[in-house]
């Protein structure tokens, strides 16, 4: 009889602890919350942040909230994106206790926690979960993206430019799936034709997959940027420490453009593109190196290399590329837009894009890569 009583008490304690941790995350606005507390007191959590600007800001808030809801045992947290596991964070009981007793700061917690891109074991534990709280499925976000392009043929004369606002409706469907519908509103440009018109932007359905062992996949179909419509498949592998990522992408598209004569014109000529990619991250200096070898839409082959320095939410980098006998280069940067947190109710949000990304391309020896 006493054995059954102990089992019942442990089960009730586990349910209570699981509910407390989940409630803390739900109060922050986290979505797709899954929690499992084992008999030994260890707790595994999965959550998705669609509230805070920047992944790491939301993760930090979630870590603090989860530790406040803990009453013993180790903590394992899986960060989701479109319900697909991306990152695993581990904290031992000693660190959690010292933080709650104010013996160490949150900064010291960050330095002692474990971070891995290997989420397989944690997701195996979460298969025992009973339900998912605050699901993102069916929620709609209206996101306004600024678009700016400057392209020069010489260093002293502006050649072409445009400034657009491109609001998009983004809706989470089922696990890994998202529907996007975007309209582009021109603000200023010295280009002609469709660039002066209100026109469709990205209208696409994407499906992501987590294949385990560090492999992730994505399939996207619809209307893309650069006047292309079709489908694209991508596969990538990343190591557990996140320092190396290898990938491949292939697609087939036709031309999709807004014309004066025919309206929205869609061609029948299918063009193929493909690329092999590699990315290396150096955490000591927050440097990211990217290399890509590709076959482009019109049959030419080329290589491109990027070097990007990350400063928290800011990033700036340079790139160089060689294709079809021509050498080109330029720089790019990303800065956060105002607003660190958005209010998201059951229906969704209306917000500005989290980052403003921009690049300027200069043609070496007067050559421009289109």
Task: State the predicted function of each range.
Residues 1-4:
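Positively charged n-region of N-terminal signal peptides that target proteins for export
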Residues 8-17:
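Hydrophobic h-region of N-terminal signal peptides that target proteins for export
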Residues 20-204, 267:
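Outer-membrane beta-barrel initiation region
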Residues 130-141, 172-178, 210-216, 240-246, ...:
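Short loop/turn motifs that connect adjacent beta-strands in outer-membrane beta-barrel proteins
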Residues 163-173, 198-211, 230-250, 272-282, ...:
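Feature captures outer-membrane beta-barrel proteins of Gram-negative bacteria and organelles
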